[in-house]
Amino acid sequence: EDTLEQASKLVKTNPQGLVEKLEHLMAEMKALQSENESLKSKAAKEALGDVMDQVEEVKGTKLLAVRADGVDMNGLRDLGDQLKEKLGEGVIVLASECDGRVNLVAMATDAAMKSGAHAGNLIKAIAKTVGGGGGGRPNMAQAGGKNPAGIADALAQAKSALEEQLK
């Protein structure tokens, strides 16, 4: 009962209204987290600017491999989806240093997969460079790592790894 009183005072309500107040606070927290994710994704997109000039061609397949620091895994996936739409057909590899850790996401379009691209195998090949591991499906994969210093090498390796995959 004493704990109930303390909890009620903490959230500025009476014990009878505690559950309702907590439900309200939880909903508010969820909405703020969602808004935060959205803003992170938007900030990452703006920080990257127009990256389409960094698109390379590997055996006739477009490859966009870029770094977007400060973006968490969800943000990278969202950003990847947006870039995939812009790219049209090809492979996208995104890397981010976030809270001292590395996040990697790879995505391949249908045409790229028909040519032999496999996001899961691609991410496995480059994740070791950042001291991590990962995997996924042919069209989307992700990995984490502990060595941000390896990001540039991992992105460079994406090109050779993709070259090996393509027919």
Give the positions of each predicted feature.
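Terminal appendage regions of diverse proteins
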Residues: 1-167
